[in-house]
């Protein structure tokens, strides 16, 4: 808790009474890298002399000045300066230099002294004694100081009375009883707290050890009193002893006096008797004669003969006092406790009076005739020190008094807390009041964006938001801005009872630690009363009638516009149903729980700032207020200032360290510094401790920092519990939230200082960024984000290709038109036909532009990004369809007779039929020769190789008879020209109709070409169902494009495209854009999801798209009929058209045999899907094996929005160059960033098969039972085999795992891969460090340097999930898994999930463990790979230790 030895036990011990070190058991895991250097530093530093107090200045690292929340210079430890004014830094006052005192006479020794233990002038201990005559100015300041203290105490008293009234009511007293007991309890507790003065050094600070409550069933209630002394239920040893003394001398004896003499017999010798007297009796007689006590109090028993000896000496003896009672008496009267073994003469202390009195408890009598019970009490009154008193309760039966006793015990603690806090806050006000008098205009604000709060005139509303604390919950009321402030608007409360426990619990009651607006206005904290919190409890301190309290509370609901009840604290919600029994019971429980909450849990650490090492690892310290291991504020500061308290880790002085205390969203940083002796503070010999504050962000016009004057801390403030001081620091104080006259916050912008002599402690407060731990979600969200501009770019590419297609076709038509001169009447019909086709081209171009615009608009509005990608595939299909139909249309014009003259026109010419076309048209003659008749140059068709190019790829339901092309018989063929019917070669009937022609090239060479026939006989069955055709032609490709577009893709492929499977060199030479589109898109798969607007396609370099195609096919098959399942069953939806059954069987058996041999067990259920065509030039063939398809589908039903969404996400992916991955292995993310596709090792593939059943059961139980888990969900295991067409059909197999992306929809700035091991787990970061995956040692180092705190709830959830998952992974013999932690600074989240949990602890890993343990890693250090049980233990311990949790709630006594 502190750097001193006196508090070391508080930091380390595991005690429910005093301190809880939440991570004590985990601190065995040390930073291995830093530990070696740290040990070297320790060895070197041990040579430093302990008594050397003056240190040479050392360079201070920048992180020391970071706590000042401002840019600063790196300077020596002696001269830390703010970098406030870069133009004139030399004039800046050092931040450590103490300002002038608020009262100069405080610096004069003997002018102002606090009461000491020997002061018995009757003044209250928490007030100052004025010694000597003070100047008029000092007297005036003292009057103001005392007035401030008086107002503080009055405010505290008003809050105290309200709590007492609630406690009495909760004790079950009637209204009448509550009335008089309320006044009595409040008076007694406040009087006792005012009188008590616990010692600071060497004695307990627990107030309950200085006060006792005794119940005496006699007299009346008003006779109850605070007895200024001690009362015990004891009597004198012998009845003849005196029972009353004035100023008696009291001797305290520990142990047993004398020895029992019952063992002596009549035969014992006189020598034995004398020996007993000399050994036991004589020392007692000697000490009595030397010290002359009046009263002897002995811890244990006293022998009979010694009792008589003491009686003979005229001394009153009381024995069986118990040691703790003697200690209380010793503390109060200042007399030592003597040991029976070493009784010696001592100067005994005395009290004012001693008496033993028998009291008749008439209220305990059962009836009037019964004997009234009596009680013998021993009174020690008027002790010389105010270190103990007793509250005597009288006036009713003992059972009733016991209830009052409980109320008194609680109330006294509250009163004591309040009194010390009031004194401390009064001192702080005195300090801050020295800065209020200065005008805000004297300050030069250095914050560029600083904007002062609006004035009352600029306030948008007269209603004021008032934070009201009920002790646990920060609530808000609105009070209309009226002058009297009596009307209350709306109370906003989450609870119906008096005390609410969530979410913030300043210990005991925040109301005690908060100033009301009335007090704030009086003290001058409020500069704009209409914009600051105010309080409603204006008359609390003047009311004592409890009946009026009850009546006022009952009438609150009906009279909410009337004045608030006098004792109704504004910080408690109004409960209109307080008479309800359940609410009453709940209120009592809440009050009891509240009063037991007397502690604070803080995260404590200590760091050597000069060396940059952690001397005290972060751990929890449970500080119970005013208990044994708590210390007063004065002692804490003295231990800080004691330069002889060397750090046990680095053997350095406290001055070299930074001390951190974190709670909820705040962190307190303490730094110690020795200032020059010349500038030291006065009164060090007298123990005077000063405090002051200085703004860290501004300067006044004379270039000095805005600073308060320093004030002397009062005795009561020095006695404040350090734990309570932390509570005041971390709770939201009204005046700390106010801005100073310079416009800066006292809380966040001011530095606070305490000083004693030449030692100064600087305290700075900063906000703690608390992170939440985000575990893998049970339900995966659909992606709504995609890389900016990517979709637009892809649509733009499709659009550009489409425009090029239409321009390519238009250019061809233009060249074709040029072949028909206007003067030649024979081609008038051709020119008209070409004009109509050009109009058709323009029309379809407009339609295309409109369609792609509409599709893009729809894609942008789709919520799921993956569906946008599917809509893009739809546009690619339409682009391909557009290219195909214009290819066929233009070829049909060239190769048919529609552009040739009619038979009547040909008779005009005597030379016979010759068709000339420079656009590449051919003329067919009887000798099967084609000549070029165009003098202007036609469309050349050079000789090229025969190529088979699939138009639309293989599709579901392809017929084997369509696999190969053929040329029909003579009677089925159709020539290009009606006069040449014998130009084709006969081929077998069973093939599709094709025309084989000899094409003469321009160089006279001859080649055999396959050209699709477009005759009418081919389209007989199609034309009957196609409806109206363009230009009256009945070929399918002359149908309107909108009509074709509306047809199902499968229907178009089956009915049209498969009958025109090949294209010739015509397209390659004359329609290059069309040829490019057909080449790129024709071999691509197209599988519809739901409808043809969403299409899944395959992309060769994106393996996830192959998986998506396979899953889409299986999904479509399942929607049609139940999917047959068997081990190694195959579904060949995308089979090679010419693949024979032998090849298929061979593939299936290959997978079967490999799986069986590898797994050595029954092979898992597999679904095999193959697709790809060997006729596709350069197109590989694929086969996909999906393991446990049904089980994975069931898992995806639980965690994914739908199966279709999952498939859509996998449809596109991008390579992901994640650092730390295996080289040449597949590692990709889906384009919507939702999933990760990772290639796994063969051993991992085999391991998963062995525990897959347990995995699915564990995940099912997690969903059904709601168990916490942080396993990154594996949603599919697929084996993708790629058979390349080149290189002899070489096969490449990829074992792929589909896993959720933990960093989905988050901006992760850095990632850690944590295995719980530190050896060889450090990686050097790159220049930018964005994509680096850091390891365990990096995480430990970063947590020490710049910790990332998590909330208590988040850490509990993480630990619970880690516990569940590691237990499961150990049960299936898995180790070497990692916790992936992504830091999202924008959302303040730590994204966590366990990954890489497919590797079992097989014999090869066991061998690796043995080798590394024996030969590689240092002694007593574990390698990364160890047995699953040891791995689980180490993994859990690391996560518990290094995830730092800031306490977000105040602790009660049960939190130990």
UniProtKB/Swiss-Prot annotation:
SMART domains: PIPKc
Domain PIPK: 1115-1443
Positions of the UniProt region annotated as Disordered: 1-110, 533-592, 925-944, 967-987, 1003-1022, 1137-1159
Catalytic reactions of this protein: a 1,2-diacyl-sn-glycero-3-phospho-(1D-myo-inositol-3-phosphate) + ATP = a 1,2-diacyl-sn-glycero-3-phospho-(1D-myo-inositol-3,5-bisphosphate) + ADP + H(+)
Compositional bias per record (Polar residues), positions renumbered to this chain: 973-987, 1150-1159
SUPFAM superfamilies documented for this protein: GroEL apical domain-like, SAICAR synthase-like
Necessary cofactors: Mg(2+); Mn(2+)
Keywords linked to the UniProt accession: ATP-binding, Kinase, Nucleotide-binding, Transferase
Compositionally biased residues, Basic and acidic residues: 43-57
GO annotation, biological process: phosphatidylinositol metabolic process
Residue spans of biased composition, Low complexity class: 1-19, 533-544
UniProt EC number: 2.7.1.150
CDD domains found in the cross-reference section: Fab1_TCP, PIPKc_PIKfyve
Family matches, as InterPro entries: Cpn60/GroEL/TCP-1, GroEL-like_apical_dom_sf, PIKfyve_PIPKc, PInositol-4-P-4/5-kinase_C_sf, PInositol-4-P-4/5-kinase_core, PInositol-4-P-5-kinase_N
Ranges of Acidic residues composition bias in the record: 86-110
Pfam families the UniProt entry points to: Cpn60_TCP1, PIP5K
UniProt-recorded Gene Ontology molecular function terms: 1-phosphatidylinositol-3-phosphate 5-kinase activity; ATP binding
Key word Metal-binding present: no
Function recorded in the entry: The PI(3,5)P2 regulatory complex regulates both the synthesis and turnover of phosphatidylinositol 3,5-bisphosphate (PtdIns(3,5)P2). Catalyzes the phosphorylation of phosphatidylinositol 3-phosphate on the fifth hydroxyl of the myo-inositol ring, to form phosphatidylinositol 3,5-bisphosphate.
PANTHER family named in the record: 1-PHOSPHATIDYLINOSITOL 3-PHOSPHATE 5-KINASE-RELATED, 1-PHOSPHATIDYLINOSITOL-3-PHOSPHATE 5-KINASE FAB1D-RELATED
Complex and partners: Component of the PI(3,5)P2 regulatory complex at least composed of ATG18, SAC/FIG4, FAB1 and VAC14.
Listed name of the protein: Putative 1-phosphatidylinositol-3-phosphate 5-kinase FAB1D
Organism, as annotated: Arabidopsis thaliana (Mouse-ear cress)
Gene that this sequence comes from: FAB1D
């Amino acid at each position: 808790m502190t750097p001193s030895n006196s508090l070391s036990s508080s930091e380390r011990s595991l005690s429910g009474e005093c301190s809880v070190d939440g991570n004590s058991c985990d601190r065995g895991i040390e930073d291995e890298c830093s530990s070696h250097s740290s040990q070297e530093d320790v060895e070197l530093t041990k040579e430093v002399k302990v008594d050397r107090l003056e240190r040479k200045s050392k360079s201070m690292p920048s992180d020391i000045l970071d706590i000042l929340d401002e840019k600063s210079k790196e300077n020596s430890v002696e001269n830390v300066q703010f970098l406030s004014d870069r133009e004139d830094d030399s004039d800046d006052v050092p931040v450590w230099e103490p300002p002038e005192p608020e009262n100069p006479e405080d610096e004069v020794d003997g002018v102002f002294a606090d009461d000491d233990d020997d002061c018995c002038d009757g003044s209250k201990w928490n007030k100052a004694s004025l010694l000597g005559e003070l100047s008029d100015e000092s007297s005036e300041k003292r009057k103001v100081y005392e007035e401030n203290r008086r107002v503080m105490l009055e405010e505290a008293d008003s809050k105290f009375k309200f709590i007492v009234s609630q406690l009495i009511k909760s004790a079950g007293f009637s209204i009448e009883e509550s009335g008089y007991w309320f006044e009595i309890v409040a008076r007694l507790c406040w009087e006792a707290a005012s009188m008590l003065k616990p010692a600071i050094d060497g004695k307990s600070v627990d107030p309950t050890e200085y006060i006792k409550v005794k119940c005496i069933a006699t007299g009346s209630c008003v006779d109850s009193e605070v007895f200024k002394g001690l009362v015990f239920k004891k009597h004198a040893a012998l009845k003849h002893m005196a029972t009353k003394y004035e100023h008696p001398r009291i001797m305290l004896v520990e142990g047993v006096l004398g020895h029992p003499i019952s063992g002596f017999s009549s035969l014992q010798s006189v020598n034995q008797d004398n020996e007993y007297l000399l050994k036991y009796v004589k020392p007692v007689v000697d000490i009595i004669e030397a010290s002359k006590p009046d009263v002897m109090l002995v811890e244990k028993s006293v022998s009979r003969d010694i009792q008589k000896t003491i009686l003979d000496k005229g001394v009153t003896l009381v024995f069986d006092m118990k040691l703790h009672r003697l200690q209380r008496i010793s503390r109060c009267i200042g007399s030592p406790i003597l040991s029976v073994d070493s009784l010696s003469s001592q100067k005994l202390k005395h009290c004012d009076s001693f008496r033993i009195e028998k009291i008749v408890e008439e209220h305990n009598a059962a009836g009037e005739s019964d004997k009234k019970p009596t009680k013998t009490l021993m009174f020690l009154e008027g002790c010389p020190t105010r270190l103990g008193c007793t509250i005597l309760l009288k006036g009713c039966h003992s059972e009733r008094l016991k209830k009052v006793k409980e109320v008194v015990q609680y109330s006294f603690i509250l009163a004591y807390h309040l009194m010390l806090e009031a004194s401390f806050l009064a001192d702080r006000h005195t300090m801050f009041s020295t800065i209020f008098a200065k005008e805000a205009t004297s300050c030069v604000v250095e914050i560029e964006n600083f904007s002062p709060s609006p004035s009352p005139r600029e306030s948008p509303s007269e209603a004021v938001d008032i934070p009201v604390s009920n002790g646990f919950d920060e609530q808000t009321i609105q009070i209309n801005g009226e002058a009297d402030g009596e009307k209350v608007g709306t109370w906003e409360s989450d609870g119906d009872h008096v005390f609410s426990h969530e979410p913030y619990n300043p210990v005991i009651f925040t109301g005690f630690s908060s100033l009301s607006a009335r007090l704030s206005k009086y003290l001058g904290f409020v500069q704009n009363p209409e914009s600051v919190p105010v309080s409603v409890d204006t008359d609390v301190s003047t009311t004592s009638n409890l009946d009026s309290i009850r009546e006022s509370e009952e009438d609150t609901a009906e009279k909410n516009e009337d004045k608030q009840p006098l004792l109704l604290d504004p910080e408690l919600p109004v409960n209109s149903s307080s008479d309800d029994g359940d609410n009453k019971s709940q209120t009592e429980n809440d009050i009891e729980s509240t009063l037991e909450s007397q502690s604070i849990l803080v995260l404590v650490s200590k760091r050597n700032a000069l060396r940059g090492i952690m001397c005290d690892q972060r751990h929890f310290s449970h500080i119970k207020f005013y208990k044994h291991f708590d210390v007063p504020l004065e002692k804490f500061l003295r231990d800080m200032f004691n330069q002889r308290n060397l750090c046990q880790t680095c053997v350095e002085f406290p001055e070299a360290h930074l001390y951190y205390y974190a709670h909820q969203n705040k962190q307190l940083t303490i730094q110690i510094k020795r200032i020059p002796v010349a500038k030291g503070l006065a009164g060090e010999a007298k123990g005077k401790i000063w405090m002051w504050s200085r703004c860290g962000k501004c300067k006044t016009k004379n270039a000095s920092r805005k600073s308060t004057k320093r004030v002397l801390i009062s005795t009561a403030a020095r006695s404040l519990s350090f734990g309570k001081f932390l509570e005041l620091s971390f709770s939201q104080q009204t005046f700390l939230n106010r801005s100073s006259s310079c416009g800066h916050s006292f809380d966040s912008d001011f530095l606070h200082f305490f000083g004693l002599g030449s030692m100064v402690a600087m305290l700075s407060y900063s906000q703690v960024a608390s992170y939440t731990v985000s575990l893998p979600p049970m339900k995966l969200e659909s992606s709504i984000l995609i890389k900016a501009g990517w979709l637009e770019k892809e649509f733009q590419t499709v659009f550009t290709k489409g425009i090029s297609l239409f321009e390519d076709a238009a250019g061809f038509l233009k060249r074709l038109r040029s072949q028909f001169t206007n003067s030649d009447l024979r081609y008038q019909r051709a020119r008209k036909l070409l004009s109509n086709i050009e109009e058709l081209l323009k029309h379809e171009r407009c339609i295309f532009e409109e369609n792609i615009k509409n599709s893009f608009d729809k894609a942008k509005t789709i919520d799921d990004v993956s569906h946008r990608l599917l809509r893009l595939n739809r546009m690619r299909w339409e682009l391909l369809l557009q290219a195909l139909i214009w290819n066929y249309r233009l070829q049909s014009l060239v190769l048919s007779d529609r552009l040739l003259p009619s038979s009547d026109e040909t008779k005009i010419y005597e030379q016979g039929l010759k068709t000339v076309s420079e656009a590449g048209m051919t003329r067919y003659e009887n000798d099967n020769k084609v000549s070029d008749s165009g003098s202007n140059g036609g469309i050349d068709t050079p000789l090229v190789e025969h190529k088979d190019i699939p138009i639309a790829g293989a599709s579901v339901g392809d017929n084997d008879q369509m696999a190969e092309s053929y040329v029909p018989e003579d009677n089925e063929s159709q020539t290009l020209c009606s006069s040449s019917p014998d130009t084709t070669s006969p081929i077998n009937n069973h093939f599709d109709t094709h025309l084989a022609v000899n094409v003469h090239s321009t160089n006279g060479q001859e080649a055999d070409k396959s050209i699709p026939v477009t005759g009418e006989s081919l389209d007989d069955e199609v034309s009957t169902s196609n409806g109206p055709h363009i230009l009256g032609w009945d070929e399918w490709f002359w149908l309107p494009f909108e009509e074709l577009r509306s047809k199902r893709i499968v229907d178009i492929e089956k009915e049209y495209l498969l009958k025109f499977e090949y294209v010739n060199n015509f397209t390659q030479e004359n329609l290059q854009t069309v040829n490019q589109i057909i080449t790129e898109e024709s071999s691509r798969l197209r599988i519809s999801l739901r409808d043809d607007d969403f299409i899944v396609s395959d992309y060769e370099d994106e393996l996830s798209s192959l998986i998506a195609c396979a899953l889409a096919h299986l999904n479509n098959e399942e929607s049609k009929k139940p999917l047959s399942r068997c081990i190694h069953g195959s579904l060949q939806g995308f089979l090679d058209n010419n693949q024979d059954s032998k090849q298929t069987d061979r593939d299936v058996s290959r997978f079967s045999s490999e799986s069986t041999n590898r797994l050595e067990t029954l092979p898992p259920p597999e679904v095999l899907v193959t697709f790809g065509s060997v006729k596709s030039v350069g197109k590989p063939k694929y086969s996909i094996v999906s393991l446990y398809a049904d089980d994975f589908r069931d898992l995806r039903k639980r965690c994914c929005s739908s199966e279709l969404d999952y498939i859509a996400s996998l449809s596109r992916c991008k390579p992901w160059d994640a650092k730390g991955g295996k080289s040449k292995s597949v590692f990709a993310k889906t384009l919507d960033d939702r999933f990760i596709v990772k290639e796994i090792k063969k051993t991992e593939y085999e391991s998963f098969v062995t525990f897959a059943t347990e995995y699915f059961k564990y995940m099912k139980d997690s969903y059904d039972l709601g168990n916490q888990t942080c396993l990154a969900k594996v949603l599919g295991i697929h084996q993708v085999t790629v058979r390349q067409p080149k290189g002899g059909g070489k096969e490449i197999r990829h074992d792929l795992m589909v896993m959720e992306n933990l960093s989905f929809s988050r901006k992760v700035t850095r990632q850690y891969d944590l295995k719980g091991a530190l050896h060889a787990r450090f990686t050097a970061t790159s220049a930018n460090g964005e994509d680096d995956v850091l390891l365990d040692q990096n995480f430990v180092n970063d947590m020490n340097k710049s910790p990332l705190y998590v909330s208590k709830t988040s850490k509990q959830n993480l630990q619970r999930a880690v516990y569940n998952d590691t237990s499961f992974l150990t049960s299936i013999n898995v180790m070497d898994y990692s916790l992936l932690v992504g830091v999202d600074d924008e959302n303040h989240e730590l994204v966590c999930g366990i990954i890489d949990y497919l590797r079992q602890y097989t014999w090869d890993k066991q061998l690796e463990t043995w080798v590394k343990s024996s030969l590689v890693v240092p002694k007593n250090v574990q390698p990364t790979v160890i047995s699953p049980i040891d791995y689980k233990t180490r993994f859990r311990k690391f996560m518990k230790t290094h995830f730092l949790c800031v306490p977000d709630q105040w602790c009660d006594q049960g939190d130990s």
